[in-house]
Structures are given as C-alpha cells and as structure tokens.
Amino acid sequence: MNILSEMPTGMGGKWVLVDYGNNFYAYGTENCLHDLLGFPVDQCGTKEEVLAHCKSISKLCKQNIDKYKKEFAREKEKSDGWKILIEHEQKELEMLTEFARILSE
C-alpha cells in the first residue's frame, strides 16, 4: 500500500489517495483507510475507474458550489450555513482535482 496524496477535508480530517498495487486504487477519508470495511465501493477500483469517478464528482461539486452561491446571494440574513457548504464543496473539489491530476500521470 502506498499513499499517493493527502489533502485536508477542511473539517479537521484528511482525504487520502491510495495505491494498493496490482492496478487497484482507492480514495476517501483517513477513517476509511483504517476502517475494517475499507473505502466505499464507488471510491475504489482500477486507476481508470477511480479517475473517472473523481472527474464525475468534480462536476457535481462545481454545480453544487454554483447552486449554494445563488442561495447565499438570495438570503437576506447571511447565515453561516451556506458558507460552510460552499467551503466544504470547494475543499472536496480541490481534493478531487488533485487526485485526478495524480491518477492522470
């Protein structure tokens, strides 16, 4: 097992990208890395499968960020809720972009 990259979640934890060898990769939180059940099934597989998943979820993050920014702009009382959601999506997007870059090499 080789940890290829670590990225902060923005909530005190880390995302990790792991190469288990034999063309098997996974990404998720540190908790997934140490969990008996391992990584979620949609976050592991061949290099190509994990890369495709990172790219797919990146698109969703971008859509969510746009949607949350619009909701935040409409809100009269600027609560921290939308800001927190935007920050979380941005951190996840950064992680997915970095992991996709690494997997593309």
At which residue positions do the language-model features occur?
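Short intrinsically disordered terminal tails
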Residues: 1-2, 74, 101-105
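Polar/charged side chains located within well-ordered beta-strands of beta-rich proteins
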Residues: 6, 61, 89-92
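Amphipathic alpha-helical coiled-coil segments
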Residues: 89-105
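Acidic, low-complexity, intrinsically disordered interaction modules
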Residues: 11-82
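Extended alpha-helical stalk/coiled-coil segments
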Residues: 84-87
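Negatively charged, low-complexity tracts enriched in Asp/Glu with abundant Ser/Thr
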Residues: 1-10
